[in-house]
């Protein structure tokens, strides 16, 4: 897979911002079929940085229940917490 197919979009949230400042990690939504090695290579190719570690979280799809009835479906996703090498940063995330 090409790195444009692996990295879906960056995750910008309160937790992602906290992790970026404290642990020098950035968070991406990634393709559910991508593995850690492919994610590492994709981030290094796309942003020209050195990656030291990748942690992956997979959220399963679930039903949305309201008043005892199934109203809809919440889609699942896969998130990657990418740890950058000391001194590295992605300019895309600065100022967010």
From Swiss-Prot:
One of its GO terms (molecular function) is rRNA binding. Keywords: Ribonucleoprotein, Ribosomal protein, RNA-binding, rRNA-binding. GO terms for cellular component: ribonucleoprotein complex; ribosome. The keyword RNA-binding applies. The keyword Cell division does not apply. It holds the Pfam family Ribosomal_L23. One of its GO terms (biological process) is translation. Belongs to the universal ribosomal protein uL23 family. One of the early assembly proteins it binds 23S rRNA. One of the proteins that surrounds the polypeptide exit tunnel on the outside of the ribosome. Forms the main docking site for trigger factor binding to the ribosome. Part of the 50S ribosomal subunit. Contacts protein L29, and trigger factor when it is bound to the ribosome. This is Large ribosomal subunit protein uL23. It comes from Nitratidesulfovibrio vulgaris (strain DSM 19637 / Miyazaki F). The lineage of its organism: Bacteria, Pseudomonadati, Thermodesulfobacteriota, Desulfovibrionia, Desulfovibrionales. The gene is rplW.
């Amino acid at each position: 897979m090409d790195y444009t197919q692996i990295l879906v979009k960056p995750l910008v949230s309160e937790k992602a911002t906290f992790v970026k400042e404290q642990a020098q990690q950035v968070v991406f939504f990634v393709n559910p079929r991508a593995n850690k090695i492919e994610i590492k290579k994709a981030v290094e190719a796309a942003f020209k940085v050195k990656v030291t570690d990748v942690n992956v979280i997979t959220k399963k799809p679930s039903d949305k229940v309201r008043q005892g009835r199934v109203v809809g479906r919440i889609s699942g996703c896969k998130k990657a917490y990418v740890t950058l090498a000391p001194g590295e940063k992605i300019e895309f995330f600065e100022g967010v």
